Structure formats: structure tokens, C-alpha cells
Amino acid sequence: MAEFSLDKSHIAGVVLAGGRSQRMGRDKAGVMLGAESLLRHALTRLSQQALHVAVNADAAAEDVPVVPDRFPGKAGPMAGIHAAMVYAADLPSITHVVTVSVDCPFFPADLVARLAAAIEHPSQIAIAASEGRSHPVFGLWPVTLAADLEAWIATDEKRRVRDFLLRHDVTEVAFPLHPTRASLLDPFFNINTPDDLVEAERWLEALRA
């Protein structure tokens, strides 16, 4: 049997930016980190790793396609992942879609390459991990799972990402901490509160040093 191989030419990317941002008190996609919004940080990183890039949000964002939830207000990040799958399935040559969260501006520059390298067959899912914790929102998903995910969202009341993963073959990819001038940074550090934003500014400066 030929070894399965997946590269950038078959991968689309979607930034999940449809959350309510209650602890931040405002839409996180538009929050400024340095001179750019969190959404722009995510798009810049993702566009270097995927053939097509879009944003899962409720309204127009930046200069990329917007992919709204088909289950608004009901399924949390799973609705965004489903929307990403549906969007990617309509693109020529695309077999997989990678999802990232808008509130994690430092996610790895080799996220997609390492997730893709870990996949052993077309229907397998790859998710990221660091520091012993999985980050299922950062996942590489076969677009063929869209119908199954849609049915699962419609019937499962909890709709947690981890519960859906239990239905499928999943591989987890551990990413190392990133060295900076200050200390080691978890690349999946996320910004949920104003205090987190202050910390992110410090990390941004440390990375630039």
C-alpha cells in the first residue's frame, strides 16, 4: 500500500473568530496586539501555511472570504469547524481544512506541515498539543467528515470537540515551547481577558528581540 502524503496544495485554512468573547468584553478578532488585530496576526500566519484562507465569523472581516456558522449560537467551536469543512469541500483539489483560533496569535509557523505529516490515511484527524494538553480547535480535518459532523451537531446537546473526536481516528501532535528572550512561550497561549492581552504584548516584544 502506498504511503499517504498530504501537502499544502490540498489544504485550506480557516480562522475561527465567531466566539462571544465575554471575558474580553469585545470582539477578540478586532483586538489590537502591537500594530495589528488578532485576526490579522492569525491570517498572516495561516496564509503562509494553507492554499486558501477564510474566516469563520458572523460579519465581513479583513479581505478574505467569510464563512458563517450554519448552526449560529448553538454548537460553539464545532459549528465553526463544520463551516470550515463545508467551505473547503467546495474548493478544487482541497481534501483537508486546518482550523486555528483567532485568540492564539503565536501558533506555530509549522503547524500545518507537522499536522499533515502525522496523518496516515485520508480520513484521519490530526490535532495539536503542547505541555501535555491537547488543543482540538487547532486541527487538520478531512472535509469528507462534514456530513457526519453536521448530523452529530444536530443530535448531540453537549457538542464538545473532544466528544466528536471520540467517533474518529485521531492523531495528536505535540509542539515544543518556543524560546524567546524572556523565557519559553507556549505557542498556543490564548488571549481571553484584558490581562492576557497585556501578557501577549510582553511575549510579542520578547519574540521581536
From Swiss-Prot:
<dbReference type="InterPro" id="IPR013482">
    <property type="entry name" value="Molybde_CF_guanTrfase"/>
</dbReference>
<keyword id="KW-0479">Metal-binding</keyword>
<keyword id="KW-0342">GTP-binding</keyword>
<keyword id="KW-0808">Transferase</keyword>
<keyword id="KW-0501">Molybdenum cofactor biosynthesis</keyword>
<feature type="binding site">
    <location>
        <position position="28"/>
    </location>
    <ligand>
        <name>GTP</name>
    </ligand>
</feature>
<dbReference type="GO" id="GO:0046872">
    <property type="term" value="F:metal ion binding"/>
</dbReference>
<dbReference type="InterPro" id="IPR025877">
    <property type="entry name" value="MobA-like_NTP_Trfase"/>
</dbReference>
<dbReference type="InterPro" id="IPR029044">
    <property type="entry name" value="Nucleotide-diphossugar_trans"/>
</dbReference>
<dbReference type="GO" id="GO:0005737">
    <property type="term" value="C:cytoplasm"/>
</dbReference>
<dbReference type="Pfam" id="PF12804">
    <property type="entry name" value="NTP_transf_3"/>
</dbReference>
<feature type="binding site">
    <location>
        <position position="69"/>
    </location>
    <ligand>
        <name>GTP</name>
    </ligand>
</feature>
<comment type="subunit">
    <text>Monomer.</text>
</comment>
<feature type="binding site">
    <location>
        <position position="56"/>
    </location>
    <ligand>
        <name>GTP</name>
    </ligand>
</feature>
<dbReference type="GO" id="GO:1902758">
    <property type="term" value="P:bis(molybdopterin guanine dinucleotide)molybdenum biosynthetic process"/>
</dbReference>
<protein>
    <recommendedName>
        <fullName>Molybdenum cofactor guanylyltransferase</fullName>
        <ecNumber>2.7.7.77</ecNumber>
    </recommendedName>
</protein>
<keyword id="KW-0963">Cytoplasm</keyword>
<feature type="binding site">
    <location>
        <position position="103"/>
    </location>
    <ligand>
        <name>GTP</name>
    </ligand>
</feature>
<comment type="function">
    <text>Transfers a GMP moiety from GTP to Mo-molybdopterin (Mo-MPT) cofactor (Moco or molybdenum cofactor) to form Mo-molybdopterin guanine dinucleotide (Mo-MGD) cofactor.</text>
</comment>
<feature type="binding site">
    <location>
        <begin position="16"/>
        <end position="18"/>
    </location>
    <ligand>
        <name>GTP</name>
    </ligand>
</feature>
<dbReference type="GO" id="GO:0005525">
    <property type="term" value="F:GTP binding"/>
</dbReference>
<comment type="similarity">
    <text>Belongs to the MobA family.</text>
</comment>
<feature type="binding site">
    <location>
        <position position="103"/>
    </location>
    <ligand>
        <name>Mg(2+)</name>
    </ligand>
</feature>
<keyword id="KW-0547">Nucleotide-binding</keyword>
<keyword id="KW-0460">Magnesium</keyword>
<dbReference type="GO" id="GO:0061603">
    <property type="term" value="F:molybdenum cofactor guanylyltransferase activity"/>
</dbReference>
